[in-house]
């Protein structure tokens, strides 16, 4: 009878089977894991929910105290609110951007990004999404689109002025 000497390490698998540890950027920022992407969508949509809420507070200030300067409104450019008093064009921008941010950058990412990325694959028992890189790009493009929309306040012509009918 022959005896086989086993190595002291785990004999089930090759040495090359282990992956190198992922960096913070690979694991949490540019991740293809559906759970991490769902959490990213959660934080970004909560940020845009805060932005939309701040826009709503400005709308309500104008409705409650028309023609009065808003507290802290001095930080707004003169093209939007000279002396903290809202111009009519800026008010329409607020209404348009509030609705756009709340519908397209807060509510939809919460439903589609968080629910579809985080919960549904776990409930189905799937290990990952079908196309994880496309899933990652969908998050980054949604974030980029929201930041570009937010930057619309800082261009010379201002943000879109379509009113509430644009998203209704």
Give the positions of each predicted feature.
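...captures the hydrophobic TM-helix bundle architecture rather than a specific catalytic motif
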Residues: 1-168
